[in-house]
Amino acid sequence: MRKYNRELQIIDTIEKAYLLGFIYADGCITEKTKYQLRTRISIVDEQLILDLHKEFPFFNKERFDFGKYNKNSKIQYSLRKTSKELYNDLYSNGVYPRKSGENKDKVNLPKLNDELMSHFIRGFFDGDGSINISKNRPNLRRAEICSVSENFLLQIQTYLRSIGIINKEIRAKKTGSKSKLQLFVVEWINSETILKLKDYLYKNATIFLKRKKDLFDSFKIVRAEDKNPECPYCKTKSCTSGATRKMKYGIAYRYKCKKCNKRFTQKAQVKSDKLLENPEEDNQQPS
């Protein structure tokens, strides 16, 4: 078992900034009797745990099969470390115990160099962010970050707006569960802005959650002049065009794929782009 040697006392690398953001989202620290840090993600994201452990080998890897107790649960992998020094270093960098409860209003953006902030935000996005895909319009995306701390999201919003990544106003999110926690969400629904967010998050990235990056990479803007777009189902460019419709989110073009015979709608990039203006009403698949 490797000893923790104050590696996270100063956040001065891409990997440390990413890990700090991920811990802000998905980690927890406790100070009762033993000083512990644990972050856990599901089996589909095991590779990220392996990547983090390779970069920070002082952590202990754990595996737990929650399916023994709930058939709908999956195997989960986690990183854990009992260390007072690690607890103190994370605390000094803004990680609080009970950060989703009584300390949620204490959570703030850490004081990092600008060149590291994108990696911190990417880490937080990989923990508590998602990309929503419309089932009816599979080329449409909405990116969002959730938190119980509205103040923390306001700080993310202010920072990203200062570099030209504009979002809708922060809103309360319907949880659809018995949880008493109130969630807030900052979201990006404009096509050009989503691509700008992607470029910001992944520039010089060395570590990330692959499935979320893949969703960003799969998003393409359909221009009005593109008469033969890629089919979002079979990925071929062999489509026939149909009607043009003015929808609540912009101009929609209907196509039929000659290969798979499926029909789909794609939004043209127009000046009055208002993609998914009413997200609560849209039929989406979060990832």
Predicted regions and their residues:
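Internal intein/HINT superfamily modules and their associated LAGLIDADG
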Residues: 1-263, 269-287
